[in-house]
Amino acid sequence: MKKILMTIVWILLLQNFHAQSQTDAVPADQIEGFTNTGWKSLNDNVIKMIGTDWMLITAGNIGNYNMMTASWGGLGWLWEKPVAFIFVRPQRYTHEFTEQEEYFTLTFFEETYRKILLNMGSVSGRDFNKMKDSGLSPLATTHGSVAFKEAKIIIECKKIYAANLQQEQFTDKELTQKIYPSGDFHTMYVGEIVNVWKK
């Protein structure tokens, strides 16, 4: 009888612990310190966010990833989905990761991180450990991609289209001479926005 009572007590304790841990746990689509607001919350000035404030494009997993600063891209609506589109040159180390991975993130920071973004865009992760002195703290997202705790906005995207820009498709021929004198045309990636986290 004593053993039966002890077993019942243990079962009740375990059930209570499980219920409490479920209550305390961060939901699967949440990141500690951030709120998953969804794409409809993106009412910021996107041209300013990307074009002048800059962003970090990151691809890979928490054990092996690379990131680069970018100021070309956009957000919009395509194929009945909320999307982000980004451009990565083939010689960039990040290109290897965006080619291989199913997901990538775009992270946006306060102005105080400008110097870090400048550094992330001027050195290659192929030759240097960009994270070493960056002061950034990587974190894993819902789908296993990488973002940073210091970000103010994290956008997680599922890659749904990739294509290399083609010289013959440019209607403004001066652009190819000005932007691509070496012929290193960007790869364009379209990603479905699957998560948006804000502080």
Regions found by a protein language model. Give the residues of each.
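Active-site-proximal mixed secondary-structure blocks
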Residues: 21-199
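Bacterial Sec-dependent N-terminal signal peptides
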Residues: 1-22
